[in-house]
């Protein structure tokens, strides 16, 4: 009776924890909406899927919803969404032991999602952009200092940094006359760009002011382009030789014979267990560059200043061994629980023990999923152009270019006010 109650309780827990969040199909549909530049449809789809995020990952829901904004279709609730996501991330530091244990036994989804270091950095970036769109310079400065503090701690604790965010902060500090802070951030940006040279991102050329430019203002256009990769779950059956599990191949694991796999999936092979590992899924995009026009005249081409695809892959590679070990520990825990329950049942009836083995093996196989959560609506890259423009209202156009510099589309801002000696920011989100 004792083992029967334990088995029933364990099965119930598994079913409760089997939720895996938004599906791959859902993500593809949202991405499709964004690639068609139909951000209203993407927002509606995300809102309809709020329950699939659950309370546990509400921060990702708010982030995916907020990432549909730019200077053309900016919504006043963007700051509310971003602030809610930030507050929920801060609350995650009070994590219970029971959640941690469940993540070992069931799957990684039992714990709330904590943003990766680069995702947290770009949460600050999006909030600053929102403040700039609302012309709330004071709060934009406060958020910039918060972002820089985060980057400083990140560098001290891990040696990591984000060159673009440091550069972005330096430009904002210049805007407010905080020259010492601007100099420090610029130096950090230069060092970080050197360390991330293989990302192909670089700092934009410095805008040179001359005596003739005294009646001009600085315009910065940021082009948030493409879609960052996301993760999918790959499930494999691993054979156990008395608690040994084979790790080989360049992928960090090896699958067993197909006959064993088939039997294990049927719950009939007691010494095999499901292990799910994440895999990077890239999202192709056509736009490879962009060109800035002011009043119909070409003035600049954008520079790749941040490669978020690179950051995503680099972070995944750095975490893969940890993911692999966690998956192995979880698989071992499931294996031991299954065998313990089976042995307990065998003391009363061998047939019941065999059935217990089949039930638990099948149940653990069904609930085994890799943690594939991420802020999947982030751009793949950020491009930037800076140009000095005479004071007054201007027509600003950004042409989207393919790899052969053919114009695929364009985005227009009418009557953009440029003020003498001031810095104006515009940003556009494209995904095609």
Role assignments for model-derived ranges:
Residues 15-41, 48-50:
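Bacterial Sec signal peptide processing site at the extreme N-terminus
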Residues 23, 56-59, 113-121, 161-163:
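Start-of-helix signal in alpha-solenoid helical-repeat scaffolds, especially tetratricopeptide repeats
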Residues 28-29, 63-64, 68, 119-129, ...:
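"A position-specific structural signal for the A-helix of alpha-solenoid helical repeats
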Residues 39-40, 75, 82, 137, ...:
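TPR-repeat structural position
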Residues 54-59, 88-99, 153-160, 190-208:
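Boundary/linker segments of alpha-helical solenoid repeat arrays
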Residues 79-90, 145-149, 172-197:
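TPR/TPR-like (Sel1-like) alpha-helical repeat modules
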Residues 208, 214-432:
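Short loop/turn and low-complexity linker motifs enriched in small/turn-promoting residues
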């Amino acid at each position: 009776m004792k083992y029967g109650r334990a088995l029933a309780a364990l099965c119930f827990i598994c079913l409760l924890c089997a939720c895996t969040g938004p599906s791959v199909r859902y993500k593809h549909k949202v991405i499709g909406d964004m690639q068609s530049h139909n951000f209203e449809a993407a927002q509606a789809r995300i809102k309809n899927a709020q329950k699939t995020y659950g309370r546990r990952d509400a921060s990702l829901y708010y982030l995916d919803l907020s990432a549909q904004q730019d200077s053309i279709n900016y919504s006043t609730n963007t700051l509310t969404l971003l602030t809610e996501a930030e507050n929920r991330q801060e609350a995650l530091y009070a994590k219970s032991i029971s959640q941690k244990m469940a993540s070992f036994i069931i799957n990684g989804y039992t714990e709330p999602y904590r943003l990766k270091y680069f995702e947290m950095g770009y949460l600050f970036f999006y909030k600053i952009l929102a403040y700039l769109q609302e012309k709330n310079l004071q709060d934009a400065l406060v958020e910039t200092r918060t972002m820089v503090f985060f980057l400083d701690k990140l560098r001290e604790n891990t040696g990591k940094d984000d060159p673009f965010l440091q550069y972005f902060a330096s430009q904002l500090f210049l805007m407010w006359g905080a020259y010492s802070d601007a100099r420090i951030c610029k130096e950090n940006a230069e060092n970080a760009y050197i360390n991330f040279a293989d990302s192909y991102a670089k700092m934009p050329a410095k805008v040179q002011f001359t005596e003739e430019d005294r009646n001009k203002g600085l315009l910065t256009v940021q082009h948030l382009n493409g879609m960052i990769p996301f993760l999918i779950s790959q499930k494999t059956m691993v054979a156990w030789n008395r608690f040994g599990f084979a790790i080989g191949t360049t992928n960090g694991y090896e699958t067993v014979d197909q006959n064993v796999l088939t039997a294990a999936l049927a719950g009939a092979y007691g010494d095999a267990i499901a292990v799910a590992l994440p895999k990077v899924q890239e999202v192709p995009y056509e736009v490879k560059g962009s060109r800035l026009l002011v009043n119909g005249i070409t003035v600049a081409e954008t520079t790749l200043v941040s490669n978020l695809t690179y950051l995503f892959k680099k972070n995944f590679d750095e975490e893969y061994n940890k993911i692999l070990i966690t998956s192995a520990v979880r698989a071992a825990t499931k294996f031991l629980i299954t065998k313990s329950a089976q042995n307990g049942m065998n003391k009363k009836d061998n047939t019941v023990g065999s059935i217990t083995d089949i039930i638990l093996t099948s149940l653990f196989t069904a609930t085994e999923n890799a943690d594939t959560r991420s802020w999947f609506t982030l751009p793949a890259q950020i491009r930037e152009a800076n140009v000095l423009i005479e004071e007054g209202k201007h027509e600003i156009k950004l042409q989207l270019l393919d790899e052969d510099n053919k114009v695929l589309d364009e985005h227009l801002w009418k009557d953009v006010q440029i003020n003498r000696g001031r810095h104006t920011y515009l940003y556009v989100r494209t995904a095609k």
